[in-house]
Amino acid sequence: MILMPFLLLMQSSDAETYDTLLRCAAFHTIEAERLVRDEGAAAGDAQNATANDFTQTARAMLSEDNDANAVETDLAQRKAEYLDTLAKGEVNEVAAQWTALELACKELYPMLSRINADSISGESR
């Protein structure tokens, strides 16, 4: 009986982590698009690479029975939410959300490093 609430807690945490990964990917994708628009094609490369890392990590969290397009669909939804908020011109809200998001993304960087290291060591075997 004690195991069930623990499992539910773990699922919630995984869902929150998945959502944060996608929000970070959306954030970096939008930043890449802005940099490309403002500074040229190569300027967004680092942001796109970071967005890809977050997206790949989110994809790795999904079980194999999930739709292959689930991550892309979820990512597009998060990105649309951010772009809608930006379009409304709610600058203070965007700044507050993105400051919180930037902190959340920074907390996930160690996980990205571990996953990347594991995948690299798995490829070299």
Region annotations inferred by a language model:
Residues M4-F6, Y18, S124:
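Polar low-complexity intrinsically disordered regions
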Residues S13-D14, V94:
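Residues embedded in well-ordered secondary-structure elements
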Residues M1-Q11:
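Sec-dependent N-terminal signal peptides
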Residues D14-D67:
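Short N-proximal segments of mature Sec-exported proteins
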Residues P5-L7, T29-I30, P110:
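Residue-level marker of positions within ordered structural domains that often coincide
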Residues Q47-R125:
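Compact alpha-helical subdomains of small soluble proteins
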